[in-house]
């Protein structure tokens, strides 16, 4: 673990790009010393940016009635709710359920016959300016961002056992 006092950040939002990138550089430098190798990609936790989650349902009409892998990928990329949240960017889309005709829930829709495919998913959104500013400060350190996560989500996942993650649990982050 590389640690350094954070500067240029207030309530999870960038207030000074150069101060923040300097803090990140020093923390990464210490982590590289401890690890014994160079770091080029990072995962970034977000505490600011007014994150929220929304459960959505997206539908796709299947052209030849047989669901293909490409149909599933198209549905995973589809974000029909984006227009509702103009200043926000989707950082995560976690599938809850796939449904074919007659609202039949299926585990794996690939190869099944249906005219439609529906995906119910939990989507996580964060203010796009917060993402852009954090990404810029990280890129100033010659690093690239692999993925963004919201801190409560990561904290919650880290405290659950496999059964709780699979079956569902309520986590209260105070």
Identify the meaning behind each predicted range.
Residues 2-42, 46-172:
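Nucleotide/phosphate-binding catalytic cleft detector across ATP-hydrolyzing
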């Amino acid at each position: 673990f590389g640690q350094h006092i954070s500067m240029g950040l207030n309530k999870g939002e960038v207030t000074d790009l150069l101060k923040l990138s300097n803090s990140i550089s020093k923390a990464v430098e210490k982590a590289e010393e401890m690890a014994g190798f160079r770091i080029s990609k990072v995962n970034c936790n977000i505490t600011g940016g007014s994150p929220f989650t929304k459960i959505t349902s997206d539908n796709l009409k299947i052209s030849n009635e047989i669901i293909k892998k490409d149909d599933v990928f198209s549905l995973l990329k589809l974000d029909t709710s984006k227009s509702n949240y103009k200043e926000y960017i989707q950082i995560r889309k976690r599938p809850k359920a796939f449904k074919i005709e007659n609202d039949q829930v299926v585990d794996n829709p690939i190869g099944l016959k249906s005219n439609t495919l529906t995906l119910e998913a939990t989507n996580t959104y964060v203010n796009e300016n917060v993402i852009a500013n954090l990404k810029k400060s990280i890129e100033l350190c010659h690093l690239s961002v692999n993925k963004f996560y919201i801190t409560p989500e990561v904290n919650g996942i880290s405290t659950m056992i496999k059964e709780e993650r699979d079956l569902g649990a309520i986590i209260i982050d105070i």
